[in-house]
């Protein structure tokens, strides 16, 4: 969508699932708020509605301004290393981003994804910006596309059950969210994580989202901060889930 000379991208919630919840757009908007508090370079998303569906959260959209232009392009990491199997390993990615001066940014992205449990950081959802005229790499692209964060398929209000589900999620970069995030921590990142304690969402930017869900995700962030700092698995911090996460998950099927 073009507006006032700028290009905006609109993304709807998943309509293909059996029970479309509309949470993906809100997940994107919540992740955007968290990113603003934690990341240096990120794409900003906000919630918008079409006029005829203004009161239906399930018909929400997330909107962002395009981060590319005629002079600056984006190349996916997966396209850069299409024939290199080893390039999909976290250490290989870290080495690549270090080679273009973006090691700190990549480390932060991994910790951010663990904080919000973003399950969709595939090889096309990160990469580099380049000069369209010279093809010179300008740096790592800003963090974008976070609609699979904050468990968009979970529609309950029970925190322990949610964490039992969360304990079964896998990162797309490595298998273990918190193991990878803990591995890439630096002293600076530890300070940044500790400074996030007490994080609260701006409710005015999440119109229509129940307060109960917002509080669930704020508690999730608090638990993930402590788990990442300790290197503990998702849901294992005392007061942040159950000690028998798999058994609790099994009960959801009854």
Explain the meaning of each model-derived region:
Residues 1-77:
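Conserved ATP-binding subdomain of kinase catalytic cores across diverse folds
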Residues 8, 29, 33-37, 104, ...:
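A broad, structural surface signal
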Residues 23, 131-254:
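C-terminal catalytic region of ATP-dependent kinase domains
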Residues 29-32, 81-85, 160-163:
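Short, low-complexity, polar/charged sequence segments that are solvent-exposed and flexible
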Residues 39-44, 94-97, 171-178:
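Short C-terminal domain-edge/linker segments immediately following a structured domain
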Residues 45-54, 123-131, 238:
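Short alpha-helical "patches" and their helix-cap loops
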Residues 56-58, 62-110:
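ATP-dependent phospho-/nucleotidyl transfer catalytic cores
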Residues 89-152:
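Conserved kinase catalytic-core segment
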């Amino acid at each position: 969508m073009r507006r006032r000379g700028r290009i905006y991208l609109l993304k709807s919630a998943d309509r293909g699932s059996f029970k479309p919840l509309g949470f993906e757009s809100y997940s994107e908007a919540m992740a955007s708020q968290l990113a603003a508090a934690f990341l240096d370079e990120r794409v900003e998303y906000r919630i918008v509605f079409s006029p005829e569906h203004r009161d239906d959260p399930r018909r929400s959209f997330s909107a962002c301004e395009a981060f590319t232009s005629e002079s600056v392009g984006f190349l996916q990491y997966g396209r850069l290393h299409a024939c290199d199997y080893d390039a999909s390993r976290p250490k290989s990615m870290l080495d690549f981003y270090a080679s273009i001066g973006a090691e700190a940014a990549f480390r932060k992205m991994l910790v951010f994804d663990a904080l919000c449990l973003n399950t969709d950081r595939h090889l096309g959802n990160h990469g580099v910006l380049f000069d369209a005229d010279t093809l010179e790499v300008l740096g790592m692209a800003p963090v974008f596309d976070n609609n699979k964060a904050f468990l968009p398929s979970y529609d309950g209000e029970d925190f322990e059950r949610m964490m039992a589900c969360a304990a079964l999620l896998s990162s797309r970069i490595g298998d273990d969210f918190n193991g990878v995030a803990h591995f890439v921590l630096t002293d600076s990142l530890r300070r940044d994580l500790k400074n996030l304690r007490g994080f609260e969402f701006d409710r005015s930017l999440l119109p229509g989202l129940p307060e109960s869900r917002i509080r669930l995700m704020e508690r999730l962030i608090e638990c993930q901060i402590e788990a990442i700092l300790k290197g503990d698995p998702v849901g294992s911090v005392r007061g942040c889930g159950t000690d028998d996460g798999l058994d609790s998950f099994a009960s959801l099927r009854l």
